Amino acid sequence: MTKARFRSAEQRIAEKQAEAAAMGVDEAYISTLVDEFYTRVRADEMLGPIFARAITGDWEPHLNTMKDFWSSMVLSTGRYDGRPLPKHMALPGLTQDHFTRWLELFYKTLQDTAPSQQAEDWFIDRAVRIAKSFQLSLFYRPDLRGGVIDN
């Protein structure tokens, strides 16, 4: 019988940070990724108008929130504790096509900036999971007859 391996929260955080470092991911890369991605989003014909309606004026708070989000995801810094879904639910005109485009831009940004293939794979895997979760929450409408109602 193998012994169960118990690790403290500090040990798990240290392991995640070591994994990130091995991929070449640190706070500086997260900042680069977020800044470059949202530069592309703002210039995008499909996503730009959605974000322009949601973020008026100073983009810095949103960028900082996204940096905190990814820092918490990758480095376990705990800097993000928000609830992003309600904000997305409040966006008028948001469709599944917007999520597809968001993923395309995110993937292209990763291809252009990621410090390693492992980092690219790690980030896109998480982004796809997040997008799928949001899409289920925003667009899934069960049909009581056993199917799915497509809006």
Describe these PLM feature segments.
Residues 1-151:
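Core of compact, soluble alpha-helical bundle domains
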